[in-house]
């Protein structure tokens, strides 16, 4: 399945808000997967200097990732398909 990055601008976000969003994202992905539309939240990185997060998902489509984030009520500015590269792959 393809990978996607979800970019977010979250000025004023707190660790508690991030934790709550993570719980909702995990729950909504599990819910959608149970409904036959697999979405997997892989990981997120918070960039404190810019108050942004980059959240990585694996799903069949961009629209599935968008739906998971909407269900979780987590705002986003952009969703982009990405290509995974790791040191082990080269």
Question: Which residues does each PLM region occupy?
Answer:
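Amphipathic, hydrophobic secondary-structure cores in small proteins
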Residues: 42, 46-54
